[in-house]
Amino acid sequence: MELNYAFNKARSTLQALTPADRHRLASICRDIQQSEDSLNTAAAKDMHKCMAACTGICCRNIRLTEIIGFYDFVYILTVAGGMKKNIRACLKHESLFSSDCIFLKNGKGPCIFPPNARPRICITSFCFEDTPVKQQIRDVNRRFKKLSRFVLARQMKKMAASLFH
């Protein structure tokens, strides 16, 4: 299914990177984590309210492929490579239709991903007015775009090399 494909593609993409590219990708991912930390700090008061009154609405009845994809898996596997086995187990429950998030522990929560290794949408979506943290959200999104451009450039380089050799 879609997520399984994205996960396997992320794994093979990471395996194909040179040591220098892995180092650069790790640096980009650390920048994402720093942006996430800034966002969490700026949103701490509202996040505390959100978590205290959490009903899990943001993880229920969702189309998971709209929340997590290839670049999210590249990010997660880079910063939390030990999650492979857990992710693979969750992917066995992927549905074609809207369902609760398959990455919730025991199907209820909390999320299996560590706080500093979550998909972009999960990092930047809130159940409260996010105007006070718009700049921090933009920063996280900008850094995820940098990650996607980096990966795309490596894929294009690999494709060009295979065409001309």
Question: PLM features: residue spans?
Answer:
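Hydrophobic scaffolds flanking metal-cofactor catalytic centers in soluble metalloenzymes
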Residues: M1-H165
